[in-house]
Structure formats: structure tokens, C-alpha cells
Amino acid sequence: MGFGREGRSSYRLLRNYMPEQKLYILDSNPTISEDAELTSDSHVELQVGPSMTDQLGTFDIILKAPGVPARLFPENFDTGRITSQTDLFLRHYGNQVIGVTGTKGKSTTSSLIHHILASSGFHTMLVGNIGLPPFEAIGDITPGSRIVMELSSHQLQFISRSPHIAILLNIFQEHLDHYGSYEEYQQAKLNIGRYQQKNDYFLYSEDNSLLQSLLAGEKSGGHRLLPYSLTDKPENGVFRRERKVFLHTDSGIREIMDATAGIPIPGEHNFSNAMVAAAACYLAGASEEQINRGVQSFKG
């Protein structure tokens, strides 16, 4: 459902594994009826334009692209039949994924994490909202790959598995065009940590007042909740002391980034992004030396 960049990659992957499976492609744009790749496929049926949603109730599985608004589904629709590239990818590779979401800052943070890990010698790929559609990365994934995913609220809305390392930067009252309410948008963002498993990590900004409120008293279901803050808070989590960053977990306090000489991306908001990127990379196996080198060589 939705035949843009991600929808096309979904079609190609499914067709590669199931060359004669009947597929229905739904899109609001009627011009896809002229797409040469689709017109040459006798096992495809197109449902386009205003009538694209007329037969939603007849499908067993709906693979929804992130650009398709959830409001197109009828009230009380069985959402258990809705999945996505993000959902299926996380079900299979979630234990290798560092996922990043937030109303602001997610592209910078995702790119910085990818740069630190790649410059440290890890096999790293960037997928999701920036980088490749998830399905296009599958052929290159190895057991040692670190997969960085930038995730929008639309990509998170119908997932059933969260990333191994989840990062929630902030939530602000923006990008609400696909949602019936601000609360619905908030809940979609919170999905990034909602389905974590034992020994996963959920990093979230304690400096964002809404996140503090939403996650106050949150009980870990085996995963580790790690707030981060620009203030000097040595409780469990990530904190700044002068221009150094520390990670405090059950195993003690470790310095993970030394920014005494500054960082190449200006502003307190970017220092916060660099803090959580450093923590994610440390949890993914990078050393403090590798983190410092990666941060200093980042071009933004």
C-alpha cells in the first residue's frame, strides 16, 4: 500500500522470492498504471485513485508504506493485518539495530552514529528515513553488522519489535498531519522502546519535559532505561560534567566522550545529540578513543 521509493523496493523483494504470487498494489496516484515494471507483471492487480481503499477488508496482510496516512483505514479496522518494511525488518534484524527517532535532530544523530561506527571499522549501514529502504540492505547484512535506522513516527506506528538500542530525542507538537491527535503521535514515537526485549537499551532525553512526563515511573520489562541530560546528573544514564560525557550503568561510571576541545557541530542541541550518539556507539562496541575520533571528524 503506497508505491513510492519504499513501496517499490517492497514489491521487488516480494517478487524476487515469490515470482508468481498474486500481489495487489494500492496507491492514490493513478499514473502508476503506466509503470512499465508493473504493466509487464501479469500477477499484479492495481487499485489506484480514490477507490484504492475500497477493498481493504479483503486482504490478509497489508504492507503499508510510511507515507500512507493511518486515517485511510476505517474505524475499528483490524490493525493486526497491517505491517511495514520497518516492522518486518525489526522482527528479523532488531537485535542489530540502533534506532533513532524524535521530532527534531534525528538525521544529525543517525548520521553521527553511522559515521562514528563506520570510521571505527565496524560494518555499518544507514537505513530508514535516510539511507536505503530497509529491504534494500538485506543482502549486505552480516552477523556483525551495526544497522543505524532513522525512524519517523509513521514508520514506528505499526511495529511489533523495537530496536536493540532505541533513542528518543524529543517530542514536539509538529508533523501531526497523519494523526487524529497529538497523543496518537506521542504513542507512535514511544513505540521505539515499547517492544524491547531483555538486555535492550532505551536512551531518552531527560531534558525534554514531555518525555520526562511520559516516561516518569516507567518500569523496565527487562530492557534498560537510560535517560541522558546536559546537566551533571550522575544517576543511571548519560550526563555531562564540564565538557566530558559519562555513562552510568549498573557496572559503574565510564567516561565515553571528551569534548574539551569542542565538537564540529555547534549548539547545545547538537552537544545533546553527540552525547546520545556517543552512548549508543559505546553500547554497540566502540571505545572512547574511537568515539572521540569519530565525533571530531564528523562533517555534519
Describe each PLM feature range.
Residues K22-D27, M125-L126, V148, P227:
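Short beta-strand "acidic-cap" motif of Rossmann-like dinucleotide-binding folds
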Residues R15, D54-F59, P66-H223, F239:
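Phosphate-binding loop of NTP-binding sites
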Residues M1-S84, P266, A286-E289, G300:
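N-terminal leader/targeting and accessory segments in enzymes
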Residues N16-M18, I116-S120, A279-G285:
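Alpha-helix C-terminal capping segments
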Residues G7, I32, R91, P133, ...:
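Flexible, glycine-rich phosphate/dinucleotide-binding loops
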Residues F3, S181-Q186, H223-G300:
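Adenine nucleotide phosphate-binding catalytic loops in nucleotide-utilizing enzymes
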Residues G4, N29-T31, I130, D207-N208, ...:
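Residues in the short beta-alpha loop(s) of Rossmann-like NAD(P)-binding domains
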Residues S10, T109-I113, A280:
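Hydrophobic residues within alpha-helices
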